């Protein structure tokens, strides 16, 4: 059976988080700050690791990221 998490690709949304963040001309720090305003604490370094797919994303983080980036959760998975 194939492993879902192999140490390299630890999430499925990283490339789209980067895509939508850049479309909104938002820095990683601004995304981090916006998440914090929602009570979700993801430092700038963690945003970088999410985008590089080297960090997992919790369900709460997923909902908050989608809200801040103004996209549906489904769009993050495309």
Spell out what each predicted region is.
Residues 1-12:
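A detector for short, charged/polar N-terminal pre-domain segments
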Residues 15-36:
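Short basic helix-loop element that most often maps to the first helix and adjoining turn
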Residues 17, 31-32, 47-50, 76:
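Conserved hydrophobic/aromatic packing and binding residues within compact polymer-binding modules
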Residues 17, 28, 44, 59-62:
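Helix-turn-helix DNA-binding elements, focusing on the entry/boundary residues of the two helices
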Residues 37-56:
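Recognition helix of helix-turn-helix/homeodomain-like DNA-binding domains
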Residues 54, 58-75:
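DNA major-groove recognition helix of helix-turn-helix/homeodomain DNA-binding modules
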